[in-house]
Structure formats: structure tokens, C-alpha cells
């Protein structure tokens, strides 16, 4: 399953908001430096979907706020 994520980094409160079936807003405390925010988003998504971090992969948007992830939950 592919999902679109709008990343909000440097937030005081971390969390995930589901806007539609495959569109999410993910807030993380980490800043977008050295991939820390991407790693935090992957961790948040894996916790949300209750799957291993290795099943969440960033397809596009490595340096963008708009990201495309693939979730392998099979």
C-alpha cells in the first residue's frame, strides 16, 4: 500500500493525523537534519500500522515535506 505523507518537523507534539484513506500528516519532534526526521516518520508510521520499521520504505520526497511511503503489511 502506498501512502502520501505531509511531514511537519520540529513540532512540540508528535503524532499522526489521517486525512483520507492514503493521505496522512505526520508530526515529529526531530529536525530535518541528517535523515533524523525521516527516521522518526518511519518509526511513527510503523507504530501506527503496528508493523516492523523494515516494512516501511520511503519511495520519494527524501528532502521534501511531501513524501511517498510504501507500507508492506503482508
Model feature map: region roles:
Residues 22, 38, 72-73:
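Detector for Asparagine
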Residues 42-74:
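C-terminal structural segments of small proteins and small subunits
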Residues 8, 29, 72-74:
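Solvent-exposed residues in well-ordered beta-strands and their adjoining turns
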Residues 4, 25-49:
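Compact, glycine-rich, soluble single-domain proteins
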Residues 10-11, 30-38, 60-64:
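Arg/Lys-rich, often Gly-containing low-complexity segments of ribosomal proteins
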Amino acid at each position: 500500500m502506498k501512502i502520501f505523507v505531509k511531514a511537519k518537523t520540529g513540532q512540540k507534539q508528535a503524532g499522526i493525523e489521517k486525512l483520507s484513506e492514503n493521505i496522512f500528516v505526520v508530526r515529529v519532534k526531530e529536525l530535518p537534519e541528517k535523515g533524523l526526521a525521516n527516521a522518526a516518520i518511519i518509526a511513527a508510521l510503523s507504530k501506527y500500522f503496528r508493523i516492523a520499521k523494515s516494512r516501511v520504505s520511503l519511495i520519494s520526497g527524501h528532502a521534501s515535506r511531501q513524501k511517498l511511503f510504501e507500507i508492506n503489511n503482508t
